[in-house]
């Protein structure tokens, strides 16, 4: 029972409910993520992912997509050794999408240009140079950043961490989340 209840452990639990009280009868450890326990930064980031997942979860309402995202992010940090900034940005953007805050990444909100040059953080949409409205908090986006955002928002969960970004692009991508 101890191993399954550790911080950043994934386990399957058998719960017995009687007269409004719940008791754990059995627990099976699925994954422990031991690599995250030996590095304070990784442990902190993994704990942050768990806290976000807790905030976005509803009691008695299973959310397999959020569980998969959280476990994949922990796996990407610990086993795959993906850059922390990349894993954090991917996790945050995909979690926002799962929570119903999917950004409009089709093209410019005004003219439909498929390759706009800035993203409105408040409005969650893209805008190009010709259509600058001035309203909102904008961040410049390159084609690489836009491709990464589109990938994270729309790809299957199994392909979520299957891309790399250069250092500068990664820093800019991280500033969007």
Question: What kind of region is each of these model predictions?
Answer:
Residues 1-177:
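Non-catalytic alpha-helical scaffolds and adjoining flexible linkers that form interface surfaces
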